[in-house]
Amino acid sequence: MVTVRREKDSMGVIEVPADKLWGAQTQRSLEHFRISTEKMPVSLIHALALTKRAAAKVNQDLGLLAAEKASAIIEAADEVLAGKHADEFPLAIWQTGSGTQSNMNMNEVLANRASEILGGVRGMERKVHPNDDVNKSQSSNDVFPTAMHVAALLALREHLIPQLSALTDTLRDKSHAFADIVKIGRTHLQDATPLTLGQEISGWVAMLEHNLRHIEHSLPHVAELALGGTAVGTGLNTHPEYARRVAEELATITAAPFVTAPNKFEALATCDALVQAHGALKGLAASLMKIANDVRWLASGPRCGIGEIAIPENEPGSSIMPGKVNPTQCEAVTMLCCQVMGNDVAINMGGASGNFELNVYRPMVIHNFLQTVRLLADGMASFNQHCASGIEPNRERITQLLNESLMLVTALNTHIGYDKAAEIAKKAHKEGLTLKASAVALGYLSDAEFDAWVRPELMVGSMTPGR
């Protein structure tokens, strides 16, 4: 039989498992929202703990919270950040849209643990109150959006941006290494004029560089914190210096550029910062999907595809076809990019659906945002390590396809005109001739003229790959 204790909130008394630190409101949420399996992300829980830690420190400094209580709350928050109470935060994403129940989950856990630190007990006789002490100068309406921004910015800074930079560096190195390899270009999935493999990969590098700039451009808005706005943005029940000082405290303990939001009404009523930041992440997903698709097409084969590059062979690809190896890293990336694009739709809908002074789609928004960051960061790390770093050119195949391409005829445009060049290409294609044989047969130029004018290495321009 499970041992219980009695906890109380404004709705009355409720039984809670005696071995748990949470209280009445957490228990009610567990009983009322048994929906699916998605729980609040750990990084969001840690961001809530950071927020409570900063608030306790500032409330103490402002003379609003007794030093011993503040110290105990800070110690309890540090325990959460160290992962000591991970099973005390069981609530579902699918709860109140303001995140109130998760805010109270944190308040209750920290209050009960702080009470124990002070020599007290858990429950109704505890020495630290979840609302009056842990939640002092706060509302769920400003705490939860603050934690969202803290979790989002730290995830972008610590996980996504480093992996994006690493993948960009790998591809830049490949671009430089393959700068002298002339290959056929393709547009509309059809043969086009030549370029170098280095130039082709340099396009991927530039895509990722642009994406990094877009993501970095979104960070200042994410760094704006709602804390201090309390219920509707007016700052009711807060000290005049509280909002600025608590943002400064969060900036100090995270070494991140957090500031108090200049307009708390916007900070509470919208998710615009995360909508816009996720738009940049969606752009990255679009670029990664294109890059991964290009890689697997260029590596297709091994004998009946394009086969211009080789990628690492990491695992067997078929349960029935012996020896088959598939571009699995590319497939994983394209799948996760699809998920990111779906997340973007959900975040856009959530961001657009707030009413009046509060957006109430916040748990869903941050769940999808953090999932996107993790998918992209992990996906880029895996793709970089197990695919991109091992890309190698198949020079023999590249040369074969280059020499067989009819689009080399484009070099003749300035010598004999477009119409005659097109006639050469069509005759060569229809009769299975080389371009040279077709041109000579039509009498438009000699062998020597063809050799002098159709030189793929001179058709790639002076564009240098990478930066």
Curated annotation (Swiss-Prot):
Family indicated by similarity: Belongs to the class-II fumarase/aspartase family. Fumarase subfamily.
Keyword DNA-binding among UniProt keywords: no
Keywords: Cytoplasm, Lyase, Tricarboxylic acid cycle
Active site: H188 (proton donor/acceptor), S318
One function term, GO molecular function aspect: fumarate hydratase activity
Enzyme category, top tier: lyase
Protein name: Fumarate hydratase class II
Catalyzed chemical reaction(s): (S)-malate = fumarate + H2O
Superkingdom classification of source: Bacteria
One GO-annotated biological process of the protein: malate metabolic process
Location of the protein in the cell: Cytoplasm
Record carries keyword Membrane: no
Broad class of the protein's primary localization: cytoplasm
Pathway: Carbohydrate metabolism; tricarboxylic acid cycle; (S)-malate from fumarate: step 1/1
Pfam families membership: FumaraseC_C (PF10415), Lyase_1 (PF00206)
Further details from the record: There are 2 substrate-binding sites: the catalytic A site, and the non-catalytic B site that may play a role in the transfer of substrate or product between the active site and the solvent. Alternatively, the B site may bind allosteric effectors.
Function of the molecule: Involved in the TCA cycle. Catalyzes the stereospecific interconversion of fumarate to L-malate.
Any single GO CC term annotated in Swiss-Prot or TrEMBL for this entry: cytoplasm
EC identifiers of the protein: 4.2.1.2
Record note on quaternary structure: Homotetramer.
UniProt site positions, description: Important for catalytic activity: E331
Binding site for substrate: 98-100, 126, 129-132, 139-141, 187, 319, 324-326
